[in-house]
Amino acid sequence: MEERYYPVIFPDERNFRPFTFDSLAAIEKRITIQKEKKKSKDKAATEPQPRPQLDLKASRKLPKLYGDVPPDLIAKPLEDLDPFYKDHKTFMVLNKKRTIYRFSAKRALFILGPFNPIRSFMIRISVHSVFSMFIICTVIINCMFMANNSSVDSRPSSNIPEYVFIGIYVLEAVIKILARGFIVDEFSYLRDPWNWLDFIVIGTAIAPCFLGNKVNNLSTLRTFRVLRALKAISVISGLKVIVGALLRSVKKLVDVMVLTLFCLSIFALVGQQLFMGILSQKCIKDDCGPNAFSNKDCFVKENDSEDFIMCGNWLGRRSCPDGSTCNKTTFNPDYNYTNFDSFGWSFLAMFRVMTQDSWEKLYRQILRTSGIYFVFFFVVVIFLGSFYLLNLTLAVVTMAYEEQNRNVAAETEAKEKMFQEAQQLLREEKEALVAMGIDRTSLNSLQASSFSPKKRKFFGSKTRKSFFMRGSKTARASASDSEDDASKNPQLLEQTKRLSQNLPVELFDEHVDPLHRQRALSAVSILTITMQEQEKSQEPCFPCGKNLASKYLVWECSPPWLCIKKVLQTIMTDPFTELAITICIIVNTVFLAMEHHNMDNSLKDILKIGNWVFTGIFIAEMCLKIIALDPYHYFRHGWNIFDSIVALVSLADVLFHKLSKNLSFLASLRVLRVFKLAKSWPTLNTLIKIIGHSVGALGNLTVVLTIVVFIFSVVGMRLFGAKFNKTCSTSPESLRRWHMGDFYHSFLVVFRILCGEWIENMWECMQEMEGSPLCVIVFVLIMVVGKLVVLNLFIALLLNSFSNEEKDGNPEGETRKTKVQLALDRFSRAFYFMARALQNFCCKRCRRQNSPKPNEATESFAGESRDTATLDTRSWKEYDSEMTLYTGQAGAPLAPLAKEEDDMECCGECDASPTSQPSEEAQACDLPLKTKRLPSPDDHGVEMEVFSEEDPNLTIQSARKKSDAASMLSECSTIDLNDIFRNLQKTVSPQKQPDRCFPKGLSCIFLCCKTIKKKSPWVLWWNLRKTCYQIVKHSWFESFIIFVILLSSGALIFEDVNLPSRPQVEKLLKCTDNIFTFIFLLEMILKWVAFGFRKYFTSAWCWLDFLIVVVSGLSLTNLPNLKSFRNLRALRPLRALSQFEGMKVVVNALMSAIPAILNVLLVCLIFWLIFCILGVNFFSGKFGRCINGTDINKYFNASNVPNQSQCLVSNYTWKVPNVNFDNVGNAYLALLQVATYKGWLDIMNAAVDSRGKDEQPAFEANLYAYLYFVVFIIFGSFFTLNLFIGVIIDNFNQQQKKLGGQDIFMTEEQKKYYNAMKKLGTKKPQKPIPRPLNKCQAFVFDLVTSQVFDVIILGLIVTNMIIMMAESEGQPNEVKKIFDILNIVFVVIFTVECLIKVFALRQHYFTNGWNLFDCVVVVLSIISTLVSGLENSNVFPPTLFRIVRLARIGRILRLVRAARGIRTLLFALMMSLPSLFNIGLLLFLVMFIYAIFGMNWFSKVKRGSGIDDIFNFDTFSGSMLCLFQITTSAGWDALLNPMLESKASCNSSSQESCQQPQIAIVYFVSYIIISFLIVVNMYIAVILENFNTATEESEDPLGEDDFEIFYEIWEKFDPEATQFIQYSSLSDFADALPEPLRVAKPNRFQFLMMDLPMVMGDRLHCMDVLFAFTTRVLGNSSGLDTMKAMMEEKFMEANPFKKLYEPIVTTTKRKEEEECAAVIQRAYRRHMEKMIKLKLKGRSSSSLQVFCNGDLSSLDVPKIKVHCD
């Protein structure tokens, strides 16, 4: 990116100059000069074109850097501040709000000049803020009229407001046209796209007035009135900027949209081939007649449902009940709109799956009719389509927004930097003037200005010599300093030159005349005044306000009062007081959460008294703080204001509780006390700040979103409201909740679409509108525009706010502790002191007993004697192999030097010397550690940091100072630990002996567990340990254990509900279970013996193995109390985590993120608690209803059964839904369903229908209860759940930074693959395929290698794709035959293409990957064509033919090679594959474990809701199908509902397998949190990271494709792959390259400038050419030499046999030689011509003409006249 220079700007009124006749004349003069320059300018020399400055674009606010606009110049024409417009006939106008407007200086409408009074008046009106506010108010009032149902009225009186609005809009347009001109000139009315919108609005508004009744249908035209809401965007400048960002993000979405449409098309074609006509299969009663296929009464229905049973006839499908058979019908599900019978419907179904809207319903329908094996199709669509492509959209929008912000910020920062540097230069000029003898007192205004400390620091931090005094001795004396500064900042030099030209300061030598002195003084004075004004503007309040505050709001009365204040201030600011208040808040929150339905009176009284007590505490806290801090200081902090509001509201609630029931809402506001926790909880504080910052920054975006929602709501109401309303056309007695009959319901439908649910409403709309495609267009448009663009930008801003908040709150990686944390630190220090004292007391005796003997000094690890700390060679090697390096940050381990040991070991004193060894106790606890250097006898140059438990503030004891070894120690290491780790890791050999069994204290007691000496009596035990150690470290042992883990996990699959009916399998599984348990037990014992208990139980992975073995052992017992442990055997697959490196890497990354995730989870719980308490207050006891059957949604009319008592009297059933708001626990579950948009409609319906406690609900009796859920979805769901994404991405990015940018989800082997994918420019020149010698082959070769041939084949592929799309179910046989024939034709064409390519390219055909792919596709297409003839036979199942058909779709994938943008995105996916594979493995493991638990717990659950014959927990396959569905949070409410019923609803007489509902809730909620919120978000984090990497590479001026094309074209000019081409061919080669490497002809002059080296024979090497062309594209930069070295290194790796020739000449030198030769030739020609003329003078002879080449030495013929050109 080229560097851009900005003029130095001073915040001064002189920046603003009125636009006058002189200004216009100056512009015209500049335009004339510019035209003359263009005529005379050399075409070869290209100058960079200037661009408009982003911060000075029209509609933006003028940056404060330019100073305040003079009042007399507001709304007046000014000279443009942007240098880009200096040669444009334009001027700018600023209003009071500093908004920039630009106008053309030419005549508007060819009449009104820029100084015409009428036009000037219109300009002042158009830019005035009152005019904008008037138009905005008009638009708002007009929108209210449009939203009102009465506006549909056709009476004449209803048209009066419409005429008024039209008149206002026309008047606005006239004013703007008179001010700007119409269309001809720059910045005229129609040159602004926003005015196009106004023009269309006016045109569509006027048309009905003039046309009247001449046009039959004006309703569509009237619908365009809704576009008037967009006028608000054209009026409000900030909205234009936001919409501009939206449009730019849409431009960047092109590649993603193309890839998405392409993938959707592929998926749709696959679905069409696999499932065409399959969804019409239903169970038909056997006793129906011949018309059963079209008679719905003959279809078998599901239990308690109106849905028909969908079935299939092959293995894995759902079978029909007795008395019915499975056959195709003429009906498809969902009003016939869900099917794969044609490409259009198939595309819609795949779009539905990709957006995850009710996709589980389609998933279940397909699996019931086609078989469970087609689950893999949905796995691909969900993971590739939904997770990858939709999140690419998020990534693109985020990057577009950040790029725009970055560009604007860069320009502003550059100008501010120049301004600061100019300030510094002027300061130095002042010093220089003083040095030259100018009176210092005249310059003290700058010194006396009231700068802030920050600015004083800035102005006093540097002392550089003046750049203006170029001729002075001072400047010459400091030339080196100036050169250094100039070299560091060449841009500053350039700006200094401009500054010296622009500013009235001209000091070029020591002898300055008085005029120059005066000018210098004036420059300094301007700067001084400016800075003083800035300082004044930053003062918080007016002086009068400050005096008033100090007089009345600062209470300093008498000395006793001051003493009381001081005491209270000490108490109230103490951390313990804050801790006490925090405890009160927590207890108060618990009290609030204890409220529930049907509370007994005693609990009510306790809660009431508790409320009074806490209200009193908070009031007392507020009063005491006001006294201690004074009101002035108390109310300056936002949290104190919030505390006072909460306290006063609580007091009002207590006082007015009995006075008026109308003020009962005050009780709900008590829940705001929970927010007081944010003061002592940084994460909650961060979340609140993020929401606050986002809402503030998103003000404009929120308006845009509101406008979009309003427009679509009104459009839906106008287009569909007449039919798609409350009344259902199919069943008039039932009422519809979601419709567009009025604005409120239309708004709710649009909001529901923005939440992601659009398909069901669209079906109902199409049903009511008789299949109108307009419903599809409008609903999909809302989904795409609203959901994918606006909400994604919302998410981008939220994540950006999160990252900014993290940076602002933690600038240096250090967190500031809250007062509560300080109080807890006091407790921890006290506890630590007591524990330390107790430890020292208990260890004295141990230290005396275990003091080492002198002869054991060489045997101990690092020496235990107080007299010496010398290490022998063996002990150092042991130390090397066992020591773990630690960083200096929080003692976090970097990496162990050996896998076998993590800690230091010794058996010495508890308080061992830090010079001898680190203490284990210090490593086990987070104690302050001191680092010491430990020298190595083998390598004296290496210094190691050893951690000591010694307090860093203490000094080494004098006895230790006497030691010789201690004298060698330094306070800390100067070597980088990472370098030590890398060096030592290469030299340290793996440990081959076991460690001590126990920690040092126990090892001293159990002598057998110490390191055994050769002559020890325990040598046999030692040898046994060494043998066990070698066994467990052997690779075969690990492989065997992995095999056993897989077998034991596989055995769990068969323990399903069918096991009792298979006694032989049950007996075999019991036997194998015992074997596996004994194997794991034996493995554990072997590891105990080999590693010792200390090593084993200090590893988290070993602890996991230990617990699983214990659970397996307990499961073998027959004790009834321990039988429940048998279910925990499902944890056995977790052992795979410690064995598989890929999953281990992901788990380690996840474990490091768990603290942050748990923190956010707790914040979400607290945040949701507020909504839970509000929900309990609003809806507790109101969800019950009186029913007469089993369907809870079919209840009696409230007029017949008004309440619960009447229901029970009438012997009906009073039923409460399982998910309700009766208590906080149930409310959490309800809100989780609302937040995941699963089951939320039933919850909202119950809330909206609620009337009162224990009262029968009525349809939409509480209609505005919807708003509670809307607010929760915005704040509780959107902000908090997306916070998970932000936290996970941010946490993983931090981990990557710690690892030096390496991917944390990949193993070392996978990183090699990743790096191989990322290599750039490493391709070597390959020898092109030689042209055959045979004429026939050569002709075919030229044909297949031509670009025309590729274009024809591409066209055939597209044609084939279109024909495949045209196929449909139920098409006539004649059409089917035509399609079959066309398919055979295409198979023949592609087969012929393959054969002729093989014929032309010979064996080289198979060296290209794409050719191999084409060949495979052709072979499969031939097979599918041959097999399709057997389709009507019953030999093979129909599914086989459907799968074989897919081979035809493979042809379409060949389109990928032609689309570069798609290849970039697929390249990002390929880069993500290793990480995604590891995350997928972890997700599969989680699903596997939960499937086993589900089989154990829920196998006997009664069928109903989401549990049926296929989707259940009876078998492992059914469990996995259910869990895959829940991975996207889809339909988990339907699976949970049957399990929330009582045990009476179990599917078996045995109640053992029926669990409590609480277990089901924990099971599903925990799985959703682990899979949906964490693992899937890890997937998203990886995709975003790799997309950013791929995009950065693709956005570089040169990418991988450019290098590939360079070498491809090089191959044509270098057919023998010599790596050289002739200099004469360079011009053609450079012209043949595509942009940006292309150097178009004529290019000889540019080659001379490149100075290319040439070798013998005028040849150029490919690397020299490539580097020269690269330099031309990227420009000269500091990193170019590094890049050249990297490119050469990569080239040498790819070309080990590179021919190295010493360049003998360069293109520049060659040109010089040629010029010299030409000069010599011309001189020699002239000389010879003179000589010949002299010889021939006076002789007469016949004239002969000889054409010579300049070499006339051989010419000796008389009588010749020579003509030399």
Curated annotation (Swiss-Prot):
Residues 149-159, 212-219, 270-342, 368-374, 595-605, 660-664, 723-742, 764-773, 1054-1067, 1118, 1182-1224, 1247-1262, 1367-1377, 1432-1440, 1502-1515, 1539-1559 are extracellular. Disulfide bonds join 283-320, 765-775. GO terms for molecular function: voltage-gated sodium channel activity. It catalyses: Na(+)(in) = Na(+)(out). Residues 343-367, 743-763, 1225-1246, 1516-1538 dip into the membrane without crossing it. III repeats lie at residues 1023-1320. Changing residue 799 to P: Increased voltage-gated sodium channel activity. InterPro entries: Ion_trans_dom, Na_channel_asu, Na_chnl_inactivation_gate, Na_trans_assoc_dom, VGCC_Ca_Na, Volt_channel_dom_sf. Keywords: Cell membrane, Disulfide bond, Glycoprotein, Ion channel, Ion transport, Membrane, Repeat, Sodium, Sodium channel, Sodium transport, Transmembrane, Transmembrane helix, Transport, Voltage-gated channel. The chain crosses the membrane at residues 127-148, 160-179, 192-211, 220-239, 256-269, 375-400, 571-594, 606-629, 638-659, 665-684, 700-722, 774-799, 1031-1053, 1068-1093, 1100-1117, 1119-1140, 1160-1181, 1263-1289, 1343-1366, 1378-1401, 1408-1431, 1441-1463, 1479-1501, 1560-1584. Residues 470-490, 850-869 are annotated as: Disordered. IV repeats lie at residues 1329-1619. GO terms for cellular component: axon; axonal growth cone; C-fiber; cell body; neuronal cell body; plasma membrane; voltage-gated sodium channel complex. Gene3D superfamilies: 1.10.287.70, EF-hand, iswi atpase, Voltage-gated potassium channels. Chain C. Belongs to the sodium channel (TC 1.A.1.10) family. Nav1.9/SCN11A subfamily. The sequence contains 4 internal repeats, each with 5 hydrophobic segments (S1, S2, S3, S5, S6) and one positively charged segment (S4). Segments S4 are probably the voltage-sensors and are characterized by a series of positively charged amino acids at every third position. PANTHER family: SODIUM CHANNEL PROTEIN TYPE 11 SUBUNIT ALPHA, VOLTAGE-GATED CATION CHANNEL CALCIUM AND SODIUM. This is Sodium channel protein type 11 subunit alpha. It comes from Mus musculus.
